[in-house]
Structure formats: structure tokens, C-alpha cells
Regions:
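Long, low-complexity, highly charged intrinsically disordered regions
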Residues: 1-8, 130-133
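Extended acidic/polar alpha-helical scaffold segments
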Residues: 22-134
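Solenoid-repeat scaffolds in large eukaryotic assemblies
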Residues: 2-3, 14-15, 42, 59
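Short, charge-rich amphipathic alpha-helical segments embedded
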Residues: 4-33
């Protein structure tokens, strides 16, 4: 009920607060029960929150369940949903790029630190593959 009221009010701070406080276990139920008129607004919220927030998995779960439950309606109105779906895709792409950069940075930092502790650190699967070991 709080989510629907926040969507009706359409106030950004209220929407953000309600969106972030929804328990993850309730997302599938709320996504299935979300009325069609609020779907586009909810997808816009996901795009905005994913771009501005560190709660990446929360956005992924919302998007997954909304798309699974409302795919027929979205497919029938492809043209009207195209901009918001592009915005969601763009937000996830930016997060994915940032996450990939962080992973590469950590990988190289560990590679730099690991030789200084020879014998203390077991070689990683990646290092064994690079050396041709199994």
C-alpha cells in the first residue's frame, strides 16, 4: 500500500524512501500486484535509483520481477515503454561498467600484493589457468 500511495503522490523523496525500504522478499508479490498505470513510473524510478544509488541488486530484482510479471503489457505497448526501458538498460550498463572496473582494479591489486607473500597465498584459479595448470 505504501508503494502505491508513493506512486500516486509522485514525490521523489517519498518514492525513494519507500523503494529502498521494501523488503526484498516482498518484491515478487509487489511487482505482480502493481497496476499497469504505475508500471512505467516504477521503471523510471528503478532507472533513477540504479543510477544514483549503490543498491544495484535491489534495482535488478525489481526490474526482473516487473518484467516477468508485466511482459505482455510491455510487449503490446512497445513504443511507449521503449524510452523507459532504454533508461533502465543505461542505468544497469553504467553500474556494470563501474563494477567491472572495480573488479579489474582489485584483481591487479591482488596480483601486485600476492608475490610479496609467496607461500602464504594459495594461487587463485585465474592464476592457475594463466599458467596453464589445471
Amino acid at each position: 500500500d505504501a508503494l502505491l500511495m508513493a506512486l500516486r503522490l509522485n514525490e521523489a523523496p517519498v518514492l525513494r524512501a519507500v523503494y529502498q525500504r521494501v523488503p526484498v522478499a516482498e518484491i515478487p508479490l509487489l511487482a505482480a500486484a502493481l497496476p499497469e498505470p504505475y508500471l512505467k513510473r516504477m521503471l523510471q524510478l528503478i532507472a533513477a535509483q540504479t543510477a544514483d544509488s549503490p543498491h544495484f541488486e535491489l534495482g535488478l530484482r525489481w526490474a526482473e520481477h516487473l518484467l516477468l510479471n508485466h511482459h505482455d503489457g510491455i510487449a503490446q505497448a512497445r513504443a511507449s515503454y521503449a524510452p523507459v526501458l532504454r533508461a533502465v538498460h543505461q542505468a544497469f550498463s553504467v553500474q556494470m561498467t563501474d563494477l567491472a572496473k572495480l573488479c579489474h582494479s582489485n584483481h591487479y591489486a591482488l596480483a601486485f600484493l600476492a608475490p610479496s607473500h609467496v607461500g602464504l597465498v594459495e594461487p587463485t584459479a585465474m592464476a592457475r589457468v594463466e599458467k596453464g595448470e589445471k
